[in-house]
UniProtKB/Swiss-Prot annotation:
Organism (species): Lactobacillus gasseri (strain ATCC 33323 / DSM 20243 / BCRC 14619 / CIP 102991 / JCM 1131 / KCTC 3163 / NCIMB 11718 / NCTC 13722 / AM63)
InterPro entries: UPF0346 (IPR010673), YozE_SAM-like (IPR023089), YozE_SAM-like_sf (IPR036806)
Family per similarity comment: Belongs to the UPF0346 family.
Name under which the protein is recorded: UPF0346 protein LGAS_0911
Length: 75
C-alpha cells in the first residue's frame, strides 16, 4: 500500500497568511488548532471533528473543497 500523507500535512501546504482565499484561511487557522487530528485521512472523521470543534471554519463547503484538492493531489 502506498504512503498517503495526512489531510493536515496537505492542508499546511495551502497556508498563505496574506491571502483572503477560503482554503488558505482554513489552513492558517487549522495550524493554530492544537486539537486538530493531524494524522487523520478519513473524510467522515475529519468532518465530524470540524463540525464540532472548528469555529474558525465559516462553512463546511470550505472543508469539502479542501478535501477534494487533497484527494486530487493524492492521485
Amino acid at each position: 500500500m502506498a504512503y498517503r500523507e495526512s489531510f493536515y500535512r496537505f492542508l499546511m501546504t495551502q497556508r498563505n497568511p496574506g491571502s483572503a482565499d477560503d482554503i488558505a484561511q482554513f489552513a492558517n487557522n487549522a495550524q493554530h488548532d492544537s486539537s486538530f487530528p493531524k494524522q487523520e485521512e478519513d473524510y467522515e472523521k475529519l468532518s465530524d471533528y470540524l463540525e464540532l470543534n472548528a469555529g474558525y471554519l465559516p462553512s463546511m463547503s470550505v472543508f469539502d473543497k479542501a478535501y477534494q484538492l487533497y484527494l486530487d493531489n493524492m492521485n
